């Protein structure tokens, strides 16, 4: 009887050790929404839970004028950029700047988001300075915002609104 129990336990141990591990899957990458960058920024503003205390203007930025592109977006090159829109105050020195870039790939979007986060001048305005900044990657989109929250909105609120535009999931948030 002891031999049967020993053999049975040995067989069970071998079966347990030889079992395949459960398959794990990486979370699915976020899918960027359809539309131009300017249209997506407008959708963002529909989702922001507070009304901006700024008169902002969203403009599509030309990829052909390299100097203006760099000045408006903060990017040094339009390499790998398919579309871009910028939203900022129409007048005055108010620390508020949103950049949305559709890149040629998700990898390029992540690279652009990190570049904007690392290299944007938070004191680019006369007499004012942004105190918050964040960047987000959603599929082939790179979203960047820097601002002074005294204008009635925070970067967290805008990132939350952008996440909603992206269907509730993003690939990365850089703080």
Name the predicted role of every residue range.
Residues 106-113, 152-156:
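Short, conserved charged micro-motifs
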Residues 12-16:
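C-terminal motif of bacterial Sec signal peptides marking the signal peptidase cleavage site
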Residues 113-134:
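An anionic, turn-rich surface loop/hairpin at beta-sheet edges
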């Amino acid at each position: 009887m002891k031999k049967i129990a020993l053999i049975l336990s040995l067989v069970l141990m071998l079966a347990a050790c030889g079992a395949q591990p459960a398959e794990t899957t990486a979370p699915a990458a976020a899918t960027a929404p359809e539309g131009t960058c300017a249209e997506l920024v407008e959708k963002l503003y529909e989702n922001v839970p507070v009304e901006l205390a700024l008169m902002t203007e969203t403009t599509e930025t030309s990829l052909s004028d390299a100097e203006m592109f760099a000045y408006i977006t903060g990017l040094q090159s339009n390499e790998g950029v398919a579309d871009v829109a910028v939203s900022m105050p129409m007048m005055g020195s108010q620390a508020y700047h949103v950049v949305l870039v559709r890149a040629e790939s998700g990898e390029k979007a992540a690279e652009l988001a990190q570049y904007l986060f690392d290299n944007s001048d938070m004191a680019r305005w006369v007499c004012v300075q942004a105190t918050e900044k964040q960047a987000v990657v959603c599929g082939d989109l790179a979203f960047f915002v820097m601002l002074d929250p005294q204008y009635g909105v925070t970067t967290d609120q805008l990132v939350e609104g952008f996440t909603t535009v992206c269907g509730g999931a993003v690939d990365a948030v850089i703080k």
